[in-house]
Structure formats: structure tokens, C-alpha cells
Amino acid sequence: MLRTESKKTNECIARKAFFFSLTAIVVALLLILPAFGADKKKDEETLRRANIVLQDMLNSKEISPEVLSKADCVLILPDVKKFGFGVGGMGGRGPLLCRRGQKFEGKWSAPAMYSVGGASIGLQAGGTSTDFVLLLMNEKVVNQVLNGKTKMGTDATAAAGPGATAASASDADILTYGRAKGVFAGVSLGGASVEPDNDANYRLYGKTLTGNDIVRGTDVKPSGDGQALVTMLDSKLTTHGK
């Protein structure tokens, strides 16, 4: 009799523990899913703004089709924030796309999200915002970026993009274009680190993918503004190839 009652008691405790655990999981999901959805909307907004930044720079002729055709990859960073006074910080993120094929001579890949951050030196009181487009000009710097964190100015040499020609485009690892308050200029991200934003890539594609998986793979299909970026860049390949 005592054994039967003890068994019933244990079963009751087990059921309560199960339902408590299940309730905790449901509550956690209810808290996480809205945040996940909100973050995904931010990712999609970043892609939308990246489309605008790249289109503006191409339309302005700041980035010539001839120089773009020499690039292995392009990293678009809309709205990079710099903050502080004297020595401050910077941060932003955006999509990286690369030419397909072993020699980076094919069409453009799906976009992989990357982040940029680090210290900045200057007299910006409060904060400033700059749009950047970075052209990665050789396989060495592409491999560095795809394989992990890359520090600008240390791991890769960067030069101002405006004024670069197809002949001089290969002199630097990275050509940098910047736009602050509508003014185009060749500006530096010296000291900033570039690395993959794995969380954003998971939200955009629904599975765990590295930056290398996305831009060097062939089975990753972008949608919406991600596909619009690919289409825009591919359209420049019709008349200007490597």
C-alpha cells in the first residue's frame, strides 16, 4: 500500500515537473520570438539601406564600373556610427558579397552580414554617421575577412577609393568610399575590425552559416533586398568584366 502511494506521489511530482518545464519553455519562446522577429526586421532594413547606399555611389560615378569589375568582394556598411570626443568608438554592420568562382570572376554571391567596430580618433563631439562601401581587391584580403576578424590598417592595407582607376585599383587590399551627410569622400576605417555577424546570418537564412558558406557556396538563395543587391551588382557585369 505504501509503495503504491509512494509511486503515485512520484508520478505526480514528475508530471508537475514536466508541466513546469514545458511552461518555462513556452514562456521563454514567447519572450524570444518577438525579439528575434524585431532583429530580423533590422537586418532587412540594413539590406534595404545598403541597396540605397550602393546605388547612390554607383550613380554618382564615385565607384566606376571599371574599378568595381576588378573587385573580388564588396562590403556595404550603411550608417556607421562614430561617437565620443577625442578618442571614441565606432560601430556598424552591413552585407558582404563576393564574385563567384575560384578566381572571383563569376556573378555575385548572396550577401553575408558583417559587423565593424573599434576605436576612432577625431574631434567628433557627440556622434557622427557615415555610409561606407569597401571594395576588397585581392584574394589575400578576402580570405582574411572570410576566415575571421580582420583589422583595418594592420591585417589589410586600405586606400581612398575616389580617383582610383582600373590600373591602380590593385595597389591596395581595400578601396574605401565614404559618404557623410551626402558628401562623398575617400575616408578611412583605420583601426576598425571587420568580422562576420553570425546571429544576423542565422536570422536571414534560418540556419547556421558562416560568411564563407554564404558567399562561396552555391545553394544559398537570398530574398527581397538581398536579391536586389545581387541583381544590381550583376547588372554591372554585362558590360564590364574582369
Enumerate the language-model features and the residues they cover.
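Intrinsic-disorder/low-complexity coil detector
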Residues: 1-3, 33, 110
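N-terminal secretory signal peptides that target proteins for export/translocation
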Residues: 1-19
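Bacterial N-terminal signal peptides
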Residues: 21-32
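Intrinsic disorder/low-complexity segments in short proteins, especially the signal peptide
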Residues: 6-7, 27, 36
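Small-residue-enriched, tightly packed secondary-structure blocks
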Residues: 38-242
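Sec/Tat signal peptide C-region and signal peptidase I cleavage site
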Residues: 32-38
